[in-house]
């Protein structure tokens, strides 16, 4: 049986936790986050929210530590899963919005509309009825110039593949201080509540986190063939290799102990 996209995504999410960016030399490396702890995001860059208001980014942060999720609302792959994992971690960690955090979701596609952002927000609220979301969750769209300024500030790299008709981009969250400084990153998907809570605590305190080595890319899964594109296939191969190496190490240790 050909594995479905949901199963495949879960496999990739699990493998991503064990794969470092060092293994990604090659054409896909330029899609990793360039982690820029200490950088200041463009608080004057203007974005449009689900109510159709166009405001500076700083107006949406409103003096709280912020979690930035960058993707696009019509993404057929992992963008919605990233938000789902984040919201689950926030709920499980007992974190409240807007007191503990502000969630800012930004589309990298300048063609997407406020109506698309509104639908994505409604979908997320349907699965996570979060008190305070009316004040603490901001799903935004923007013009290309504003998107580019924000992406550059946080080290987010993406490119559009006309053959796939999809954006190729990294998966992960950016944590920002109330003043708009990049505090740290939690990359991949499958976020643990403790990691999210710790990242928010650092951001609230104005601290910088260490760089995260994990890389996961969001793009094409071919449901017809059950195959992933090049980058994700590499993840699967690397995961298999790591499993073999781990088993070999355990067997070697067992043999060494018996030999003693």
Q: How does the language model describe each region?
A:
Residues 1-12:
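Bacterial N-terminal signal peptides that target proteins for export
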Residues 20-23:
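N-terminal signal peptide c-region/cleavage motif recognized by signal peptidases
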Residues 26-58, 84-88:
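N-terminal "domain-start" segment that seeds a small globular fold
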Residues 56-86, 103-104:
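Short active-site neighborhood of thiol/selenol oxidoreductases, capturing the structured segment around
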Residues 83-147:
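Structural microenvironment flanking redox-active thiols in thiol-disulfide oxidoreductases
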Residues 160-218:
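Extracytoplasmic/lumenal ectodomains and periplasmic regions of secretory and membrane proteins
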Residues 222-243:
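Juxtamembrane/start-of-transmembrane alpha-helix segments at the extracytoplasmic/lumenal side
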Residues 246-260:
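Juxtamembrane interface at the cytosolic side of transmembrane helices
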């Amino acid at each position: 049986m050909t594995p479905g996209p949901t199963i495949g995504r879960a496999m990739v999410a699990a493998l991503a936790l064990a794969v470092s960016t060092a293994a990604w030399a090659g054409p896909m490396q330029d899609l990793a986050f360039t982690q820029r702890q200490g950088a200041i995001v463009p608080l004057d860059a203007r974005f449009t929210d689900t109510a159709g208001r166009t405001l500076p980014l700083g107006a949406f942060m409103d003096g709280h530590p912020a979690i930035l999720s960058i993707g696009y609302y019509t993404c057929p792959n992992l963008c919605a899963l990233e938000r789902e994992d984040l919201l689950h971690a926030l709920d499980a960690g007992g974190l409240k919005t807007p007191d503990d955090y502000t969630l800012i979701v930004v589309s990298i596609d300048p063609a997407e509309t406020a109506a698309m952002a509104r639908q994505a927000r409604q979908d997320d609220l349907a699965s996570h009825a979060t008190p305070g979301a009316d004040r603490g969750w901001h799903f935004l769209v923007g013009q290309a110039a504003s998107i580019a300024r924000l992406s550059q500030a946080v080290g987010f790299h993406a490119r559009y593949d006309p053959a796939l008709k999809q954006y190729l981009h990294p998966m992960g969250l950016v944590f920002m201080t109330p003043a708009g400084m990049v505090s740290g990153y939690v990359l991949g998907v499958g976020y643990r509540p403790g990691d999210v809570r710790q990242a928010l605590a650092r951001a609230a305190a104005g601290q910088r986190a260490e760089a995260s080595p994990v890389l996961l890319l969001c793009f094409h899964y071919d449901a017809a063939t059950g195959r992933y594109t090049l980058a994700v296939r590499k993840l699967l191969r690397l995961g298999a290799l790591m499993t073999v190496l781990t088993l070999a190490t355990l067997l070697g240790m067992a043999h060494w102990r018996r030999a003693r």
